[in-house]
């Protein structure tokens, strides 16, 4: 029997961002009781070079995971290319992807399109933040 996986990420502790604990609490409402939790603290979503994310993907490739649950899409990736690669692996392994706060029916063409539109805006937000940081120096 394949398990659910919950993935949570927070790049920095800020008062205006949802904590890892907050993400986990919301995702647990969607997950089976025995869900595995993968947590990356202090890692950006600009790429997938994150220890817990890589462990989760290894479990997906091994056929151990049947569903991945995130609080919000941008917690898993802020890169169009990385997100597309992840979704290809999920599709090949028949893994369902679920955002606990955004409702996309990825079984339907419109749901898949909306998912891709959201990841475009997640990448745009990351690049805008990077530009602002560079402007301050």
Model-derived segments and spans:
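Short, structured surface patches at the beginning of a domain
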Residues: 1-136
